[in-house]
């Protein structure tokens, strides 16, 4: 199926394997591409792309099942019966087959006039996914086909990309009217989920293409893998993330025994649309299973993942001689991952992607760390359950940004809050100034009006996907920058001054675009009339010819009517015959002898004349030449804009930061948020704190007022470091825990917070152990998920961390769960020392307050009434006296008979299991021991006391009984 192997040589003398490989399950398919295309991109670097398809195939070779089951799409265009093989069909179908061979793993959209057509299996899949009518091109050979109009193709491409398909666009490279041969066609772009540029992308979300790489997993310089590991005794993994649609490009590196898990976690946090891995990469099955959550997973040849190939490619892209200035000195894996992503983009887009001109190496210590579990549990950017209202997320609650760039920065800031006190304080100062001056704040926010997505407009221009209206939209957006700069210049805080200095108004770019393009250009260049008058003298002359030519045609019509005496004579035009004179059959006898017959109709005859032919030539050639000139001028304009790409990106980043700060100030003013105070000690002290999401939800739905509560944690010498929160379900324990995390997140984002006051020592990482719904659905037990997440916390948390543990131990037997919860509290108290909130239904744990110095009991407020209980939703000092579980069940609507029976059973168990406090001590045992709260000995003593008739005992008998029980405890306790 593949073409002959082609070997190319890049600028570094590296022999490269064939250009394209498709891995269909375990079958490897090879194919080639054109050296001329790749030489202009990566100096001869081959594509090196593989795609793994995990879907089952049906009998025709088409992928069955939903696209969510498909890693990345792969079809064989030649999987037809021999008598229907397109390679032996018409020249057109042979042309199609050649293009399909170059892109066997993509749906081939083949341009035919005003339509993109698909054939064979591609047509069957597109028909099913897009609800298109499936027809046949050749009735005898039964070639399935379907198509979509070229002017509406974007919406169809978007639907396919969102479902994980890969698409190749094969366009006409010459005007069909100018050739009598088969129109030349080439694949101009390959679209993948990770390289999508369509307008359907969410304006507040990135569309990341990711690379996941472990140093040594590929063939370094085509030698044995072991050679690549020399000097790397520890595991080194890297993740690179590139949003082609905005130019955002970053990479990170992880080292040590947990590097693989950290890399996968970083990857999933970014929620990429597509992930790249080396062809030979073998990751642990549990981590590889997590990667299945990514819509598309693609394999790239090993030679791409080498220092010799990847690093020089990144240097060329960034136009530097070394990557040290980007913080990548000593971080080879991160640089290689970045190079693999770049190579994939340049190859699929057949473009150098000039808008990608910067790379950020992310230092983990620079941000408050969050893992995917915490992001999911706290519902920071996505609801916990599919289909749930996204207003339950922190992102939607805080999103008062007015530009797409600001919205994306807000999302990124939520996922990576700051961990640098100076940077946080700088944001506080800027927010405080805008918060305190309504007029200046609103002036800044008004200036954002009309600023479109500068980053994505620039990307479309860079990748040659922009139409005239996109470039005009760029100019309209840039025209708003002077007003924004004036508004920001009025501010005095340091960060506002920095933004003003970075904000280039780009008036030269705005003026050039406005001068070159008409005010309201057509959708495409092919429509003509894009370039403004006065830009090109030849273009203006050709337009005059075209206009005057049409006037001349009208004059010819009038003259010929007078000459022939035929009042109904018409001069008309169509694309087949050009200009012609039409005379009805009744007037044919009046036709002059110099008329040349062109066409006979039922009721008329059509003629031409030498004069009409000459005018036709002038008019049509003028139009075609005009389009050529307009394309040239538009290309020059595009090049000019791209020369300012770095300036546009810097200004776009400045707009985003200004939008974010103005958003924080707007929220603070409207929602009574206050400025946090940063402390050197590891403290979390909040007065009258509220949960930002729930508070806003209650206000919008008018469901009452949120009850504020205090929080005090101190991992230093004073105050409690661990709060044990008890009380009934539905009482507010989980809300209280999450509320503490939200305060920390917002404070370290640089935002004001929903509290009367907050004093905070910076947190290095937030851990949560709350739910397990996602992993349970993937076959892992609730208890296993819980223990795995708890192990991560105990093994990696530091004194500066914030830990939230909600109902630990509920997934196993009562005594096992209690024992593990007890031991975990002891460990967190004695070893970790982190600020911890521990919500529990094990009331026995409240005894630890007496044993452990920095443990404090809190309970949710409950009011008992004749009709049951009322949740007060306030947090009180002390332990809950009981769980009220049966009362909660009654409120949930369980039948009265069940409630009464439950009360009876509860009383029985309380009598049977009433016992003394556990003997366990807070100190850690030298050897592992099973913590036993209730022992058979204790139960026997309780049973003996309950069976004794105290009223029948004499004082002496009572003393003797007490002595016996005491002696038994000493001997067997």
Outline where the language-model segments fall.
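ATPase nucleotide-binding head domains, primarily ABC-like/P-loop NTPase cores
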Residues: 120-123, 222, 234, 331, ...
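Charged catalytic and DNA/RNA-contacting regions of genome-maintenance
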Residues: 2-61, 65-433, 446-462, 466-558, ...
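Charged, surface-exposed helical/loop "interaction arms" that form contiguous linear patches used
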Residues: 467, 480, 533-534, 558-568, ...
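Extended, charged helical/alpha-beta scaffold domains that provide interaction surfaces
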Residues: 107-110, 114, 554, 561-585
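C-terminal low-complexity, glycine/proline- and small-hydrophobic-enriched intrinsically disordered tails
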Residues: 929-940, 948
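Terminal-proximal interaction/regulatory segments of ATP-powered molecular machines
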Residues: 574, 933, 949-973
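Active-site phosphate-binding and catalytic loops of NTP-dependent enzymes
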Residues: 170, 193-201, 352, 492-495, ...
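Extended, charged coiled-coil "arm/hinge" scaffolds of SMC/Rad50-like chromosome-maintenance ATPases
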Residues: 601, 605-639
């Amino acid at each position: 199926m593949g073409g002959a192997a082609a070997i190319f040589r890049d600028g570094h003398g590296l022999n490269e394997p064939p250009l394209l490989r498709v891995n269909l399950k375990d079958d490897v398919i090879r194919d080639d591409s054109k050296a001329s295309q790749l030489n202009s991109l990566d100096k001869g670097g081959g594509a090196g792309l593989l795609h793994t398809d995990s879907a089952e195939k049906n009998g025709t070779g088409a992928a069955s099942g939903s696209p969510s089951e498909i890693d990345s799409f792969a079809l064989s265009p030649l999987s037809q019966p021999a008598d229907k093989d397109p390679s032996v069909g018409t020249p057109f179908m042979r042309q199609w087959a050649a293009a399909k061979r170059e892109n066997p793993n993509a749906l081939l959209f083949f341009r035919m006039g005003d339509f993109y057509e698909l054939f064979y299996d591609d047509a069957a899949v597109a028909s099913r996914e897009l609800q298109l009518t499936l027809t046949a091109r050749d009735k005898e050979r039964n070639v399935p086909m379907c198509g979509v109009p070229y002017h509406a193709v974007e919406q169809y491409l978007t639907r396919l990309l969102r479902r994980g398909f890969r698409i190749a666009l094969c366009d006409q490279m010459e005007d069909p009217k100018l050739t009598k041969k088969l129109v030349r066609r080439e694949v101009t772009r390959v679209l993948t989920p990770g390289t999508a540029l369509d307008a359907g992308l969410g304006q507040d979300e990135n569309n990341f293409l990711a690379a996941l790489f472990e140093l040594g997993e590929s063939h370094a310089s085509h030698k044995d893998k072991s050679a690549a590991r020399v000097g790397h005794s520890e595991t080194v993994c890297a993740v690179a993330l590139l949003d082609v649609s905005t130019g955002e490009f970053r990479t990170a590196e992880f080292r040590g025994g947990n590097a693989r898990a950290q890399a996968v976690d970083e990857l999933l946090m970014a929620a990429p649309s597509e992930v790249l891995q080396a062809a030979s990469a073998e990751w642990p099955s549990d981590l590889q299973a997590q990667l299945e959550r990514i819509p598309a997973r693609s394999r790239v040849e090993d030679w791409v993942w080498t220092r010799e190939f990847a690093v020089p490619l990144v240097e060329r892209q960034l136009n530097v001689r070394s990557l040290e200035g980007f913080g990548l000195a000593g971080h080879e894996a991160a640089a290689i991952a970045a190079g693999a992503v770049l190579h994939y983009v340049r190859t699929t887009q057949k473009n150098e992607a000039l808008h990608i001109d910067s790379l950020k190496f992310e230092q983990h210590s620079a941000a408050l760390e969050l893992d995917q579990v915490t992001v999911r549990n706290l519902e920071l950017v996505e609801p916990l359950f599919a289909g749930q209202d996204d207003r339950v997320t922190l992102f939607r609650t805080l999103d008062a940004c007015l530009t797409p760039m600001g919205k994306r920065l807000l999302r990124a800031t939520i996922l990576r809050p700051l961990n640098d006190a100076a940077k946080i304080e700088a944001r506080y100062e800027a927010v405080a100034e805008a918060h305190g001056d309504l007029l200046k704040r609103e002036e800044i926010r008004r200036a954002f009006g009309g600023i479109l997505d500068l980053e994505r407009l620039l990307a479309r221009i860079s990748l040659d996907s922009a139409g005239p209206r996109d470039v005009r939209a760029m100019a309209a957006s840039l025209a708003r920058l002077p007003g924004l700069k004036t508004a920001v210049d009025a501010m005095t805080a340091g960060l506002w001054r920095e933004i003003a200095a970075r904000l280039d108004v780009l008036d030269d770019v705005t003026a050039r675009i406005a001068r070159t393009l008409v005010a309201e250009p057509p959708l495409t260049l092919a429509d003509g009339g894009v370039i403004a008058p006065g830009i090109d003298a030849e273009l203006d002359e050709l337009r005059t010819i075209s206009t005057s030519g049409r006037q001349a045609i009208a004059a010819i019509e009038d003259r010929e009517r007078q000459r022939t005496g035929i009042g109904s004579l018409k001069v008309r035009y169509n694309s087949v015959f050009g200009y012609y004179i039409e005379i009805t059959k009744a007037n044919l006898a009046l036709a002059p002898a110099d008329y040349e017959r062109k066409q006979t109709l039922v009721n008329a005859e059509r003629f031409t004349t030498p004069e009409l032919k000459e005018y036709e030539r002038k008019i049509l050639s003028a139009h075609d030449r005009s389009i050529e000139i307009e394309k040239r001028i538009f290309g020059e304009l595009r090049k000019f804009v791209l020369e300012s790409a770095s300036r546009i990106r810097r200004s776009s980043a400045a707009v985003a930061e200004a939008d974010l700060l103005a958003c924080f100030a707007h929220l603070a003013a409207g929602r009574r948020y206050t400025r946090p105070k940063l402390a050197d000690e590891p403290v979390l002290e909040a007065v009258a704190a509220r949960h930002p999401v729930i508070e806003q939800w209650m206000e919008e739905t008018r469901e009452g007022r949120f009850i504020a509560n205090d929080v005090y944690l101190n991992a230093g010498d004073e105050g409690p470091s661990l709060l044990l929160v008890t009380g009934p379900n539905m009482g507010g324990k989980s809300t209280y825990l999450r509320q503490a995390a939200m305060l920390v997140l917002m404070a370290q984002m640089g935002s004001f917070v929903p509290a009367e006051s907050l004093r905070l020592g910076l947190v290095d990482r937030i851990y949560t152990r709350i739910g397990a719904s996602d992993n349970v659905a993937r076959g892992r037990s609730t208890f296993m998920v819980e223990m795995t997440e708890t192990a991560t916390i105990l093994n990696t948390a530091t004194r500066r961390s914030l830990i939230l543990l909600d109902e630990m131990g509920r997934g196993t037997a009562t005594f096992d769960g209690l024992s593990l919860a007890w031991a975990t509290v002891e460990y967190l108290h004695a070893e970790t020392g982190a600020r911890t909130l521990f919500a529990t239904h094990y009331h026995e744990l409240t005894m630890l307050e007496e044993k452990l110095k920095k443990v404090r009991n809190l309970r949710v407020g409950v009011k008992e009434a004749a009709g049951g209980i009322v949740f007060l939703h306030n947090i009180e000092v002390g332990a809950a006296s009981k769980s009220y579980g049966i009362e909660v069940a009654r409120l949930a609507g369980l039948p009265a008979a069940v409630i009464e029976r439950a009360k009876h059973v509860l009383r029985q168990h309380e009598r049977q299991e009433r016992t003394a406090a556990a003997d366990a001590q807070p100190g850690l045992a030298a050897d592992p021991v099973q913590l036993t709260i209730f022992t058979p000995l204790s139960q026997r003593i309780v049973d003996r006391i309950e069976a004794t008739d105290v009223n029948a005992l004499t004082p002496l008998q009572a003393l003797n009984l007490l002595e016996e029980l005491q002696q038994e405890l000493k001997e067997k306790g």
